[in-house]
Amino acid sequence: ESGSGKSTLLNTLAGHLTPDRGAVRFDTRADGLRDTVTMSEPERRMLSRTDWAFVHQHARDGLRMNVSAGGNVGERLMAVGARHYGDIRASATDWLGRVEINEDRIDDRPSAFSGGMQQRLQIARNLVTGPRLVFMDEPTGGLDVSVQARLLDLLRGLVREMGLSAIIVTHDLAVVRLLADRLMVMKDGHVVETGLTDQVLDDPQHGYTQLLVSSVLQV
C-alpha cells in the first residue's frame, strides 16, 4: 500500500537516506563486506557508480534530459574512468541496442523519447558499468500496460543474462510474480510477511497479505 515505507526502505538501503540506527552491509568488489552507512560520501558515491545502480520510477529523475541518449550512457562510463571516445560511443551504441533503442537515436535527447523509451534508456545508463545490485523503485509505474509488459520482459532478460541481484519496490503483484524470487510485504512501516514469492502469493499467511492477494490476483 502507499505510505507503507517501501520507498523509504529502498532509499535507505541505497544510501540516499541515513538510518537512525543499524547497519547496511554489502559485499563490495573492492573491499569485501562493508557497512555502507559508515562509508564516507566519496566511497558511497563510487559504490553507486560501480557495484550499484538505481532505476527511478520516473525516468526523468535518473536521466539528464538535456544530454543525448549516447551521452547519458557515456557519462556513466566516464564516471568510472573511461576516457576513449570511440570506446565509450561503441559501448553506448551496444547498450542502446540491448534495451531496444535504435542506434540512429544515439544523438537524440531523452525529451524526444516516449515514456517507455526513456525508462529503457535509464536502464541502459545504469547497467552499462556492470553493477552487481540494482535498486528499482516502481520501474513500470505510470506506463501503459503494453509498455509495461515489454519493459518487464527486458528487465527479466537483463537480470538473468548479467546475473544481477535486484531489490524492487512495487505495489503491482504481477511485477512481483514475474521478477522476484523472494517477496517482503510491508504495512505501516513494518514487514508483515516474507518468503519465496510463489509461496507467499499462493499461500499467504498474514491477514493483510491475504487481503492484498485476493484483491489483485486470482491465485
Give short role names for the model-derived ranges.
Residues 14:
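Helix-to-loop junction immediately C-terminal to a conserved catalytic motif
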Residues 87-104, 213-214:
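Conserved ABC ATPase "signature" region
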Residues 176-178:
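A short, surface-exposed alpha-helical micro-motif characterized by mixed small hydrophobic
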Residues 194-195:
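ABC ATPase "signature
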Residues 23-46, 200:
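ABC ATPase NBD Q-loop/coupling interface
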Residues 109-113, 117:
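Conserved ABC ATPase signature
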